[in-house]
Amino acid sequence: MSTAVRPDEVSSILRKQLAGFESEADVYDVGTVLQVGDGIARIYGLSKVAAGELLEFPHNVMGMALNLEEDNVGAVLFGESNAVKEGDTVKRTNILASIPVGEAMLGRVINPLGEPIDGKGPINTDIRLPLERRAPGVIFRKSVHEPLQTGLKAIDAMIPIGRGQRELIIGDRQTGKTAVALDTIINQKGKGVQCIYVAIGLKGSTVAQVVNTLEKYGAMEYTTVVSATASDPAPLQFIAPFAGATIGEFFRDTGRHALVVYDDLSKQAVAYRQLSLLLRRPPGREAYPGDVFYLHSRLLERAAKITDDIEVAKKMNDLPEPLKPLVKGGGSLTALPVIETQAGDVSAYIPTNVISITDGQIFLESNLFNAGQRPAINVGISVSRVGGAAQIKAMKKVAGTLRLDLAQFRELEAFSKFGSDLDKSTKAQLDRGARLVEILKQGQYIPMPVEKQVAIIFIGTQGLLDSVDLKQVRRFEEEFLAMLEQKHPEILSSIAEKGTLESDIASKLKELGEKYVASFKEKSKA
């Protein structure tokens, strides 16, 4: 006998079924590829897409929306554009381009999307921050006042860099720009500064060499390398510096110190020019787009020294949600952008732009490099606009006369080429200048602690080296500093701890210098 279903049962079954029904359907905003080529895709649809939003193409290729036009969207592809074809479906991801950050990034080599490329497995970090972010406002900053020692005598004495500063390294190819940046990274060992090295458009072999150098000197443990090599697509070279800045900002906003090296921004500008022309943006001077200045200014303005007041720091503009509970005051992000000039032309478009954005520049010259002066810094036209406030008192004291002596030496040297009969005082000045130039020479990857720099520059500016043979100056420096370290460590530790050159220490140093010069000359004769 069949049992009849009662109407009230039917209604209760229907109610149960309806209660479990999800009324919301997943709505995907999708578009269609109209045209693709040269790493650029034109997409129809995606009417609600945001500028800088990540897009998902077939075959796991990611892209980013850059041009939002009336009837289509211009996007750049972060992978092989051969995998994408006309008519393909493109999905919005609803997330702006971002990168993982945190301590787990240290010691790793990544691409600009935050994916590891060093074969050491995945990176375990939960925090992701957007690539593009507004720089901190004036209220949240503090003036630069702590030194960032590079370990290079010529820079720390005459072109000092402070934490939170932007100092440009500029010069022709093969003048030692990368070497200056790497020396600075190696010198941060044990100083609590996290470093980020961004390689833009360099050869893959060069990046591998940089990583090997950093590993050899134990610097990789506090360094992240962001690599967009010459073989990577232009969009990756364009976003690489922003990825480096974002990793550095995590340390800056959590009350720590970070140093980011962009090597080099001229290649980023070329990649951006390529993208802009392919997106049919109007070209300007040297065919660069009109906003190439803004490209570099918005990047370099993110380097800052943050206020010590934690309550003010917590209200920082554009602070991403994951960072809010971690914010501390007093952090800094220092930027060392690198620009390559063509035949020493610093008045070209990109060099003048970046010179005007940064707080000073270090000029490296090929003729000085070829003459054996390394680092090949032209002290006359190199400048640090804010670093003076960050220099330790001891260095300020000895370096003031150094800059003046060198300037006079350069002037006299130019005149002395014309005349052979020089008076005694001119000859003495030329001799001292030549020895000071010799002191400032330094080997690669052997940064010097600031207290040793102060000691040897003091000996040079006091004229104690005037009687030492020019060819023996480097040997004298090595032996004198080794003697100080072994027999008189209290002198070096006093300079290091107090940051000043006390009068009693100065007179003791001078006395030791005079004695050592005499014994050194005796030894040399023998």
From Swiss-Prot:
Q: What does this protein do?
A: Produces ATP from ADP in the presence of a proton gradient across the membrane. The alpha chain is a regulatory subunit.
Q: Which GO terms describe its cellular component?
A: plasma membrane; proton-transporting ATP synthase complex
NCBIfam families on file: atpA, PRK13343.1
Q: Which protein, by its recorded name, is this?
A: ATP synthase subunit alpha
Indicate which residues the UniProt annotation says bind ATP: 171-178
Cellular localisation: Cell inner membrane
- Sorted UniProt keywords: ATP synthesis, ATP-binding, Cell inner membrane, Cell membrane, CF(1), Hydrogen ion transport, Ion transport, Membrane, Nucleotide-binding, Translocase, Transport
Sites annotated Required for activity = 382
State the EC number(s): 7.1.2.2
The domain of life is Bacteria
Protein source organism:
Chlorobaculum tepidum (strain ATCC 49652 / DSM 12025 / NBRC 103806 / TLS) (Chlorobium tepidum)
EC class (word): translocase
Q: List the disulfide bonds.
A: none
What quaternary arrangement does the UniProt entry report? F-type ATPases have 2 components, CF(1) - the catalytic core - and CF(0) - the membrane proton channel. CF(1) has five subunits: alpha(3), beta(3), gamma(1), delta(1), epsilon(1). CF(0) has four main subunits: a(1), b(1), b'(1) and c(9-12).
Question: Which N-terminal residues, if any, form the signal peptide?
Answer: none
- Spell out the family assignment given in the record's similarity comment: Belongs to the ATPase alpha/beta chains family.
Listed under catalytic activity are:
ATP + H2O + 4 H(+)(in) = ADP + phosphate + 5 H(+)(out)
Q: Which PROSITE patterns match?
A: ATPASE_ALPHA_BETA
